[in-house]
């Protein structure tokens, strides 16, 4: 009886491990071009400037198994600001990355890898810890389902509606030239 229980337990454990492994997509699926279509933050700068912000773009590429590069193109009143940041994977428990140069930790909260990703960023600047959530979409038109997921996750992190901005589309600032 004991052997049977142990065998069933091991079989169940193997089955759960196989199922979990089968549902974890290849990390490289998050690579490619993304539109930053929504933001949530409680920083003074964001709350003051959010109505002037437009949709940004990002291109994610993998440099190695545990390292990725993100190229950004963000429209500003005086032109298009572009930069790149390299992140290293810090955890096997989910997609968590850290950038030494930007002093920023990013975590993939939710994604289907095909159409949307919700990213949560934490950064320490001038002794203050700042947080921002971003909704990434593969196209400028984000699905209502992805928007609902973003708003739900924002609410779970105590962001109010005033702290969330859906960004208007723009065409002049792209990652294609980064």
UniProtKB/Swiss-Prot annotation:
Signal peptide residue numbers: 1-20
Primary location group: secreted
InterPro entries: Calycin, Lipocalin, Lipocalin_CS, Lipocln_cytosolic_FA-bd_dom
GO biological process, one term: innate immune response
Alphabetized Pfam families for the sequence: Lipocalin (PF00061)
CDD domains on file: lipocalin_Ex-FABP-like (cd19439)
Subcellular location: Secreted
A Gene Ontology molecular function term of the record: oleic acid binding
GO cellular component annotations of the record: extracellular region
The keyword Disulfide bond appears for this protein: yes
Similarity comment: Belongs to the calycin superfamily. Lipocalin family.
Name recorded for this polypeptide: Extracellular fatty acid-binding protein
Organism: Coturnix japonica
């Amino acid at each position: 009886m004991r052997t049977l229980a142990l065998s069933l337990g091991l079989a169940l454990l193997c089955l759960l491990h196989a199922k979990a492994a089968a549902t974890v997509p290849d990390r490289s699926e998050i690579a490619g071009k993304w539109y930053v279509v929504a933001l949530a933050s409680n920083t003074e700068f964001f709350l003051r400037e959010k109505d002037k912000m437009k949709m940004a773009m990002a291109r994610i590429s993998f440099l190695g198994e545990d390292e990725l590069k993100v190229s950004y193109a963000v429209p500003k009143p005086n032109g298009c600001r572009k930069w790149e940041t390299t992140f290293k994977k810090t955890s096997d428990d989910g997609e968590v990355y850290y950038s030494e140069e930007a002093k920023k930790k990013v975590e993939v909260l939710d994604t289907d890898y095909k159409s949307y990703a919700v990213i949560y960023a934490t950064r320490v600047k001038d002794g203050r810890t700042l947080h921002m959530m971003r909704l990434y979409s593969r196209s400028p038109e984000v699905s209502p389902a992805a928007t609902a997921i973003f708003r739900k996750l924002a609410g779970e992190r105590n962001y109010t509606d005033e702290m969330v901005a859906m960004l208007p589309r723009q065409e002049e600032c792209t990652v294609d030239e980064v």
